[in-house]
Amino acid sequence: MTLLAIETSCDETSAAVIRDGVVLANVVSSQIKLHAEYGGVVPELAAREHLKNLLPVTQNALATAGVKPAELDAVAATQGPGLGIALLVGFKAAQAMAYALDKPFL
């Protein structure tokens, strides 16, 4: 089974490709510098950065793994715990990818 996993629970956007329990790629985009001036994570800023970073991070993970979207068996996303607005970005994006590819959403 080849799985695309999306993670956006806080201030890092991550996409991983896993095949039969082996991680083929794990790409992470950090927002530490963005939030540093505020002394902590600002949920609205985190969500906006996820929107900006999710597609390139996902494309990078798939390319690194050498997997085409049609070769995926399922798409998954973090459902919690985390910042609600940040989780929503990854959850809905992963749902949309699964729907577009006609694959199960986990």
Listing of model-derived features with the role each one plays in the protein:
Residues 1-106:
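Short acidic/glycine-rich loops and adjacent helix/strand connectors
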